[in-house]
Amino acid sequence: MAYVKGGVWTNVEDEILRAAISKYGLNQWARVSSLLARKTAKQCKARWTEWLDPTIKKIEWSREEDEKLLHLAKIFPAQWRTIAPFVGRTAHQCIQRYERLLAEVAGEVEGEDASAVASAPATEGDQFPETKPARPDAVDMDEDEKEMLSEARARLANTQGKKAKRKDRERMLEDSRRLSQLQKRRELKNAGIDTRLSKRKKNEMDYNADIPFEHKPARGFYSTAEEEHENDSERLQHKQMHRTAADAPGPSQKRDKATLSKEDEEKKKEQQKTASAQRTLQLAQLDLQDQISKRRKLNLPEPQIQDQEMEEIVKLGAQGEALHKRYADGVASSLSGDYDDKIVDDSIRTPQIQQSKVKTTIEEIKAMENRSVLGKRTEEEVDDEAEADKDGFAIPKLPSNKAVTSVSAGSDIGGATPAGMTPIKRDALGLVGSVEATPVSILRQKLASLPKPKNDFEITAEDEEEDEEADKEKKPTDNLPVDKGEQARLKRIAEEQERQEALKTRSQTLQRGLPRATVPEVTYNDAIGQEVVALLREEELRFPNKGDSVALMQSEFSLDDLVDAETLIEMELMEGDEQEVQEEGIKTAALPGTVARSDESEEEFKTRVEIISDQLVETLTSLAETCQTEETALVDKFKAYAKRQATLSKKLTSRWSQLESVEVEIAVFSELARMEEIAIEQRSAALQEEVDWLVKKERAAQDKYRELKVKEQAAKGGH
């Protein structure tokens, strides 16, 4: 016969369940149930969530919890797993308490302590044994229970599996390797050999030595980037001077750099993809948060008038209207007033009526269960649910004042309750005096009597600008001494501006950094040629080449004069024919070594140009061949000298480095000798002080011994 799992939980099963959960957690219920032969995974989970969980409250219910439970039961009927988190109890506890409250109102049972009911032991026929206390263990357990207990002990004792043991073994090996490496480095360091654990690759970080994403703050008020750049450049030059040919990178290193650059590019692409995806996700989350924040909770006001009150008002109004119509034409018509449309919208809360809220709520639930039309809620219930406060409680209903009508036409105050009177009186005939003014109405009258504001203001921005200028003048950095580096930087900027201004007055050749043209010795008859020669000579005098000892001349023309002259030249060029000017220039131009002829035709001129060009090409070719021959002969001749120079340079570099190291050692040992001399003097003085102190103490002890000896002899002689 197959055994059906389930039934009452015993104390042994509870302890096994707690131990299994501590090992396997709250997700592997199949493994947990494998330790319990009589329980399934679902039953184990239910036992934990309904009874064994330490967060479950097993004390008696308070009045606030009862109110919250009844209110949520109206909003979420039969949804106990939804109600349980709000109340702070389990779903089964909520069901039991709800049924017990209904039974108490019906008079079936008397009020008892909830903890006493919950602590009642489970029986074999109990429908929910997971919610009851465990049954005590029998003195003589069954064989299957003993087997289950022994198996659970054996399995729970093995706290480490194969993987955990392997991880522990690897961790121990790693610790031993690290300690041995540390001891090796310590011994080498004591021997004077400094070693590193590993060589870091490019774009890698040692998180034990470096600080990731570190941004150091700037030092001082002025930037020292230029000085650091100069120091780096000088340091680089110094390193390049002492670098030998053996330090040149080999083909393997070049390949490593190429592979690293490719890997860096791939990493950058992957980082860009992930960054774009993360940015899209963040934008989507921000949009979702904006939409959630825009959807506000719908808070409806509490109904000011109930159905019963409305019926009473309608009945009273119908009776009054009938009486008014009955005596409208008679003499007594003046004795009754017209009270139509006198219902005021102002809400006045009266003192709360002391009554049992739990009892009232239970009666409402009973009425809701007994109504004929199921599934439909009244407007009163909907308003009650909408008016629930933030803690889940419904605001208690108070007697409404909608039944009270407005005061007489002469009174302009509504909703006040002076001297404990009825808030608003029905006085169509004006029999009652006007209500006294409240402090709020008095304040409103005084505010209304104030003069109207005038909007004739003028805004002057000059004072603000002056204040801003004064604030700028009063900077905290004005009292600080000016940095010399900052002064040099400002001076360089001013000199650069002056140089740019002076450069604008020079010719285009100097502005663009082109080679200068030589001043021809030919005398021109036309005015343009003479002016060009004069400009070239003046430029040589005003802006000589480097190394020329020629006095500078001040410019006779200002920048405005040069701009005007350039404008006139452009206007004159625009008026003439550009192609005609070019043809005339080609005809009148003379090649180097020739003289231009005015009677020469265009074809003769082209033929002469081709002949001279061929001659120039042949001459240049022969010169290039001669230079190459001479260069080859010189290389063969000075090859031994070049090799000798490289060898001597290498030896000189090595000797220089040795000399530097020897000088450093001499300086270090000299300083060490000086410090040792000082230390010897200090130690000698300290030792001398100790010796003097010992001598002094020894003398004092000898004197004391002598005195005691004398006293002893005197004492013996007296006897």
Swiss-Prot record:
It is found in: Cytoplasm; Nucleus. Residues 167-189, 253-272, 471-487 have a biased composition (Basic and acidic residues). One of its GO terms (cellular component) is nucleolar peripheral inclusion body. Residues 29-52, 80-102 bind DNA. GO terms for biological process: mRNA cis splicing, via spliceosome; mRNA splicing, via spliceosome. Keywords: Coiled coil, Cytoplasm, DNA-binding, mRNA processing, mRNA splicing, Nucleus, Repeat, Spliceosome. Residues 252-286, 687-716 form a coiled coil. Associated with the spliceosome. This is Pre-mRNA-splicing factor CEF1. It comes from Yarrowia lipolytica (strain CLIB 122 / E 150) (Yeast).
